[in-house]
Amino acid sequence: MLEFMDYVQFAFYNATKWNYENSYSQLTATAKGLLDFETPGGLRFNLSSLSSPNFATSYALGSVGLVDGSLSYLYSSLPLRTTAQSAKIDLHEIIRGYRQIQELRRVDEPWMLEQWHGGRRIDKRDTLLYGRLYLPQSTLEALYLRRITPTQQVRITAVSDSRLRNGGTILALHQYDTGKYSTETLYSTDGGLLGLRGLYNFGPDPRKEVTEPPKQMPRIDDKFYGRFSAGAELYYGTLNKSGGVSVGGRFATLPAHRGIPLTATLTLNPLMGNISSTYAVRAGKNLSLCSRLDFNVYSYESDLVLGCELWKMRAPVEERRERSMEAKLAWRLDEVDLEKEKKPEEVAGVLKARVDQNLKVGLVWEGRVKELLFTLGTSIDMKRRDQPFRALGLELQYSS
């Protein structure tokens, strides 16, 4: 489950119309959401608030062996009109599971963001500032996020910690997204790392408008609607004189597909000899399955992980209505309004489970009780019969 500050940052992306999923770093996001979920350890409580559309605060207190916590503050120059109450937040927005790839949209033109007053431009670039202080470690995290143009964004993150080399590190990232393709250029002070990422989407170009009317063709209900994306990553450490490269591809069905939604990825690291393949499918309305196989061509070592996600919905409660006076006088029942809109199903909870080839199991139950969001999870090692439970934790979140 996302923390409140991460939820607010995604709200900033949506408000500025930035497609954070159109990136090579998000190529395997679906498999990570289904297989790499964190199991809480100990007891942790988060208290957050979006006190104004531009300012948010969050306080966390945990107990894992010793008492620790954190203080977080966030400022956005763009007012964020998003649901902040934990009792009303849509669980689909904070619980990361199977993610349906959406259709590519056309990026706004630069002139669409211009605002003029008295012959002068008064529009400003949308900016987000975020800081978090961990106690008692006195570790400080900071984030600077700024939209430059509709297709460009700058993201700078910094960590200050006495335990790190040189007392901290800074990571600068420049993102460029046209919809059809995206690139990312990064630099990190940790080892003088330079990197370049790119992702290309095959198929129609959202930047080109369709001027000719589509030809009349017979409808084919079983047509396969999907999109194939391919990308690569290249990085080099200027201090340690070492580098790396990876390539990958993804095929995912689109919302227009009438069949079972699925996502398949294949990534390759030729220098290390690692090959990773994932396959995720939404087997039912509330059930998703996923598998991942990692293989090294040099050592012949492999790793297999299986996972599932099950959404449990609350049973609808029918409203009891008394018969109208007109129906009583006519000795009949009221007519049933078949056109009445049905209320959306309410989520009771989400169960996530994974198991690897070493029989290590992870279980997480996430949901909402009254006005509290909760995450209950455990890690189990089936090979250790004496102490199978490795960790057990509960995390609570309240926001207003």
From Swiss-Prot:
Predominant place of localization: mitochondrion
Coiled coil: none
GO cellular component labels: ERMES complex; SAM complex
Gene3D superfamilies: Porin (2.40.160.10)
Membrane topology: Multi-pass membrane protein
Signal peptide coordinates: none
Family under the similarity heading: Belongs to the MDM10 family.
Protein name: Mitochondrial distribution and morphology protein 10
Source organism of this protein record: Sclerotinia sclerotiorum (strain ATCC 18683 / 1980 / Ss-1)
